[in-house]
A protein has these predicted regions:
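Glycine/proline-enriched, intrinsically flexible loops and inter-domain linkers
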Residues: 1-129, 135-250
Length: 250
């Protein structure tokens, strides 16, 4: 994190979509470049290795399914999983009271000065469809607490997952009934080159709290309380044998 960043170019190297694994082989040049840009390459190597391993297992399991069922039946099953997710979400939405509900959550600094940053949500329930509209949210800020559109969608889905029936599957079909409106240039859909390293914490937490505030109005019995936001301790120092250690108290 660069807490004083005022544009994304202050936040480290930027990478387009690249293949770290190509034709089943690790790209050593890209791997070494990633590790070279980390203060804790041993931790990064472990994290990336775990993700690669889990992805390979997932690919193998999916291949096994297709091999056993055949392409046509396998694709039909995968489509059915997405459709089931959609039906489950529509059922949960239909159980909410139709109407328009609004709520806001706030952050109190743009990383340079004290200022209220509002994340405003207007939630519309109509039958088995849901619209979450961030119109009225504060404009993007100078500091690194801006959100890209993908992060905003993720925060909304996280809030819904916590509020609604936890047995609802989490897949692309699940979110077909959800329409998200996030004005370009706002703190929840910032224009380039806005800095946004912190976006998975702020404004993600503000987005979730605002969504919960609106959802609680249409079903108070399932209301989710907010929490202490980002109060995490970090310990760091030099290792006796060289290198740096970091302990993040999540």
């Amino acid at each position: 994190y660069n807490a004083k960043a005022t544009e994304i170019f202050h936040e480290g190297i930027r990478l387009p979509v690249l293949k770290l694994i190509e034709k089943g082989q690790l790209r050593d040049d890209l791997w070494r470049m990633l590790l070279l840009n980390s203060r804790c390459p041993d931790l990064l190597e472990g994290d990336l290795g775990a993700m690669i391993g889990s992805t390979r297992i997932g690919a193998q399991r999916l291949s096994d399914v297709i091999r056993n069922l055949g392409i046509e039946k396998g694709n039909a099953y995968l489509t059915a999983i997405l459709d089931y997710g959609e039906r489950s979400m529509r059922k949960a939405i239909a159980e909410l009271k139709d109407g328009v509900y609004s709520a806001s959550d706030f952050s109190d600094t743009d990383c340079f000065k004290l200022v209220d940053i509002e994340t405003r949500v207007t939630l519309t329930i109509q039958g088995d469809d849901m619209t979450i509209d961030f119109t009225g949210t504060s404009p993007q800020i100078r500091g690194f607490k801006n959100s890209g559109i993908a992060n905003t969608h993720s925060a909304v889905y996280c809030a819904l997952s916590a509020f609604l029936d936890p047995s609802i599957p989490k897949n692309e079909g699940t979110y077909r009934p959800i329409k998200i409106i996030a004005p370009l240039g706002s703190v929840v859909n910032a224009r380039a080159p806005a800095p946004m390293t912190m976006n998975t914490v702020f404004p993600a937490i503000d987005i979730m709290n605002a969504c919960w505030g609106a959802l609680a109005q249409c079903n108070p019995e399932r209301a989710c309380a907010g929490w202490g936001k980002s109060v995490f301790g970090i310990s760091s120092g030099n290792k006796p044998e060289g290198g740096v250690f970091v302990l993040y108290h999540w």
